[in-house]
Design a protein with these regions (language model features):
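Hydrophobic core segments of transmembrane alpha-helices in multi-pass, intramembrane catalytic enzymes
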Residues: 53-58, 134-138, 187-195, 238-242
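Hydrophobic alpha-helical transmembrane segments
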Residues: 6-14, 51, 85-90, 132-136, ...
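N-terminal, membrane-interfacial amphipathic/helix-forming hydrophobic leader that caps
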Residues: 1-86, 93, 97, 217-261
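Membrane interface segments of multi-pass transport proteins and intramembrane proteases
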Residues: 32-40, 110-115, 157-165, 224
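Functionally important transmembrane alpha-helices
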Residues: 17, 21-29, 172, 177, ...
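Hydrophobic alpha-helical transmembrane segments of integral membrane proteins
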Residues: 85-103, 169-191
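Membrane-interface helix/loop boundary segments of multi-pass membrane proteins
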Residues: 145-170, 197-204
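Juxtamembrane helix-loop-helix connectors linking adjacent transmembrane helices
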Residues: 36-45, 72-142
Length: 261
């Protein structure tokens, strides 16, 4: 039985990579070869194809998530509530603040400068630089798909054969590696750890999704906002580091109290 759960994370990540590339290929062929839309027009509106791809991925992985854990549907979980929704957003903002500090450091290290440049170029290319497309893909769709995959499927499978702390750490490292950029991998791993802690505590996928959403929202705003607004955003996310740390530490202490009862 444990061997089955050991294989699920590997197979789920492989399925995501394979399905993403296959869907993009099919959409591209459909648009260029069937509808005979020019490559330039396709590039200008390719974000609609990406949104469609993410919609399919959400459907596929949410269905897989439900099928895998259908027998555990009655497990205790924290209902959605304003306090935890706000707390999750604060954690996401705080993680973004730490990420900003890490990127500033990485920019000063010659060995990491190319990784920072590649990461920035990749962010600019999301949805062809279209604000609406970037919001729908990076801020809404990506957090849903990735949290279902890495917290709902990968992490939850690892709970079956590893201690909670080890499962959170390993799944978070996989989440970081998945981003294929050493600078991005570092802060994605940190975000994965905090999202994993909240999911382990609450057993409600909405909370890690909100952490991811808040982080990506700030990143998007920084990419589109003028420099004056960016300065205010930077101050805001730095201020959020302390309350974010408090919320995560409080969750860990509550876990310990629950274990001792």
């Amino acid at each position: 039985m444990k061997k089955r759960y050991f294989a699920i994370p590997i197979l789920a990540i492989a399925l995501h990579l394979l399905l993403s590339n296959l869907l993009y290929f099919l959409v591209e062929r459909l648009v260029l070869d069937v509808f005979h839309i020019s490559p330039q027009q396709f590039m200008n509106y390719s974000y609609w194809g990406e949104i469609l791809i993410y919609a399919v991925l959400i459907l596929v992985f949410f269905t897989l998530y439900k099928l895998l854990w259908r027998k555990e549907i009655s497990e205790p979980r924290t209902a959605t509530n304003f306090k935890d929704v706000l707390g999750s957003l604060v954690v996401g903002f705080g993680i973004c603040g730490i990420s900003g500090l890490w990127i500033m450091l990485a920019e000063q290290l010659p060995s990491l400068q190319k990784s920072v440049e590649a990461m920035n170029a990749g962010a600019e290319n999301i949805a062809g630089g279209n604000a609406f497309g970037t919001f729908m893909i990076a801020v809404i769709a990506a957090p849903v798909v990735e949290e279902i995959l890495f917290r709902g499927i990968v992490l939850r499978s690892m709970w079956k054969f590893a201690p909670a702390w080890a499962a959170i750490l390993i799944s978070s490292v996989l989440f970081g590696v998945y981003h294929l950029n050493i600078v991005q991998a570092a802060y994605a791993t940190l975000m994965g750890i905090t999202a994993g802690i909240l999911y382990e505590k609450k057993r409600n996928l909405l909370f890690p999704i909100l952490v991811h959403f808040a982080n990506n929202l700030i990143t998007m705003l920084q990419g589109f906002a003028p420099s004056e607004v960016n300065e205010l955003i930077s101050i805001f996310i730095l201020i959020m580091i302390a309350p974010a740390g408090y919320i995560v530490c409080r969750s860990l202490r509550q876990d310990k109290r629950a274990d001792s009862m």
